[in-house]
């Protein structure tokens, strides 16, 4: 993170170090918004020595141009920072008013076979640059990283933060330690994906012999890739041959839908397969997996007929699943 320049500098540095060590730091939103809050305090309270309730409440107040969700995104890093200080007895400031989360209606992109072929063809055709280590690393990593998302349904964050010790290349199992809600779970890899990871591990180890992260970032001294890296590379590969809008997270949706679609003519064992899918995708309760009912035409009726259970489609925010 950029250097803090307000009276909060020391506490912000300690907070950032703690979040990074806990694998809870989000470069895309935390860094930007915490930096803006730091500048706000420096400008408006140049003589202050301690954080006050007024500073926090004024900054976190919902602006006229903001929706509830955009306000939540802007202030969450500050709320987290305040909670960090309070848990250590460094402040008595209470949480500011946090707007209620708005449920968004979201229909993810439905991939066609042609689009997926185009996308992975683009991933496989990244040009060589033997003298540029970062480009060599990118050429090795991008095709494997996105195939892992496609074939396993893991979240983009889970893939980014995989350590080498989390990937069992002997048994073909991923240990997902950092997940939404921090629920550890395991994912069994398809044989073809396991073989690809073995080849990748051999190639990337020559560039990063003692790497900590399974997918190391040259620009971060071997640390994990950022959310922006995933988004930018997906966008570049996607639009090379495709036109419709899509985002990386939708590979997870595709994984769930393809699995569920393949079961619709099976009565026996349907519930067990749904439970397995739920666990492998890191859902703490099977109700979370019901979100995908709304994405497969007629599936709710099929499930009700096969399991004698009413498939009630929950109102959820897609990013939660």
Regions found by a protein language model. Give the residues of each.
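Conserved catalytic core of the tyrosine transesterase superfamily
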Residues: 1-321
């Amino acid at each position: 993170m950029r250097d803090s320049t307000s009276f909060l500098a020391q506490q912000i540095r300690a907070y950032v170090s703690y979040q990074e060590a806990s694998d809870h730091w989000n470069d895309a939103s935390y860094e930007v918004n915490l930096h803006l809050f730091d500048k706000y305090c420096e400008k408006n309270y140049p003589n202050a020595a301690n954080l006050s309730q007024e500073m926090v409440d004024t900054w976190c107040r919902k602006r006229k141009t903001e929706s509830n969700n955009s306000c939540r995104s802007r202030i969450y890093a500050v709320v987290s920072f305040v909670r960090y200080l309070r848990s250590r007895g460094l402040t008595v400031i209470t949480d500011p008013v946090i707007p209620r989360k708005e449920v968004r209606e979201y229909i993810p992109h439905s991939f066609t076979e042609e689009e997926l072929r185009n996308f992975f063809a683009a991933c496989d055709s990244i040009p060589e640059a033997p003298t540029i280590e970062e480009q060599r690393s990118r050429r090795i990593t991008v095709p494997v990283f996105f195939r892992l998302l496609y074939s396993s349904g893991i979240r983009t964050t889970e893939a980014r933060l995989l350590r080498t010790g989390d990937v069992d290349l002997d048994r073909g199992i991923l240990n997902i330690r950092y997940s939404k809600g921090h629920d550890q779970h395991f994912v069994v890899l398809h044989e073809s994906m396991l073989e690809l990871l073995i080849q990748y591990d051999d190639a990337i180890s020559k560039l990063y012999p003692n790497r900590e992260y399974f997918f190391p970032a040259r620009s971060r001294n071997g640390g994990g890739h950022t959310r922006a890296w995933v988004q930018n590379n997906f966008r570049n590969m996607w639009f090379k041959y495709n036109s419709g809008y899509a985002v990386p997270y939708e590979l997870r949706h595709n994984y769930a839908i393809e699995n569920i679609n393949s079961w619709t003519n099976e009565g026996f064992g349907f519930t067990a397969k749904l439970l397995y899918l739920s666990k492998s995708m890191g859902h703490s309760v099977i109700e979370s997996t019901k979100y995908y009912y709304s994405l497969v035409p007629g599936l709710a009726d099929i499930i009700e007929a096969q399991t004698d259970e009413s498939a009630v489609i929950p109102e959820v925010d897609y990013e939660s699943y």
